[in-house]
Each structure stands twice: as C-alpha cells, then as structure tokens.
Amino acid sequence: MSVTSGQLSTSAVATAAGLSESWAWKARDQGVLTEPHFEDAVVALRVYAFVSQIVWPGTRRPRSARQDLELWQSTAVEAARQAVTDPHTTPDTALYVLEDSVHLVTTPAERAAFDLKCLGGRVALRLPIGLWVTELPDAIADVPNRRRRKTNQSKPAA
C-alpha cells in the first residue's frame, strides 16, 4: 500500500508521526531511521517511540544506561515498516508486540482468533498499524514545507 513516492526530511518524518524531533534523532542514532526517508519511516518511528519505552514485567532495566534496541523491538519496527507497502494491510490491521514475538493481523476475526489462540493472559501491546497507514497521506500532506534560510551573501562594494 504505497502512499507517496517523495522523500521526507527527518524533521518531516517526526512531524508526520506526531512526535518531537528528538524521537527522530534517537531513532536515527539507533539505526531505525536511515536516509533517504519515505512514508514507511513515519510508521516505523511511531512504533519505535512505543516499543523503545516498554519494559516487560519481570525485566530490570536501568533508566540511566543507554538502551540499545532488543531483537523484539527491531522486529516490531521492521514489521510496521513492511506493513506500509503490504497490499494486505487494511485499516483494521494491528501489530501485536509480545515479549518474544511480533504478529501482524489484518481482520477483526483474525484479531479475535489471535487473542484466543496466543494471548491467554500474556502481556501484549496492540498497535493500530492499519489505521496509521490509512492516515499517512493526510499526515504527510499536513507537514509544513520549510523554506531554506537565505544565506547572507556579501554585497559587492559600491
């Protein structure tokens, strides 16, 4: 489900994702965002902002130490990125993030079946990836165009 074909700046990705630029810079520093940026980076950044903050029950993580992405976090970000261009992605598509796995489900019936079959009291995060993909064209269109500042050029002596 390709939304646009244009490249986006790091700032535009953050704005379209509804996040501060600091999230985009953190994501860039951890290798989540690499240039050039396209529409899939917007959804990937949103997912990164969620999963980078999760600490599963029973897991200890010092707040002051630099936190590199764990495998499940990277997998969640990449699954979200792939959902943007997946022709099976619908507004009902959801990304389930569990401590040991990531699952994309497309329909409400699949969500119910997944809940019954796989969750059974487990902690999970459900992200509305399909809705975010559906909102991408408007989110990107609403990003204000920034004009480059004019540089002060030396005026010729008169």
What does each model-found stretch correspond to?
Residues 1-24:
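Polyanion-binding surface elements
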Residues 2-5, 39-43:
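Short acidic alpha-helix initiation/capping motifs at coil-to-helix transition points
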Residues 16-18, 65, 124-125:
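Intrinsically disordered, low-complexity regions enriched in Ser/Pro/Gly/Gln/His and often acidic
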Residues 17-41:
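Major-groove DNA-recognition helix of helix-turn-helix-type DNA-binding domains
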Residues 19-21, 68, 128:
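Acidic, low-complexity intrinsically disordered regions
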Residues 42-83:
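A short, Lys/Arg-enriched interface patch at domain edges and termini
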Residues 70-158:
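Low-complexity intrinsically disordered segments
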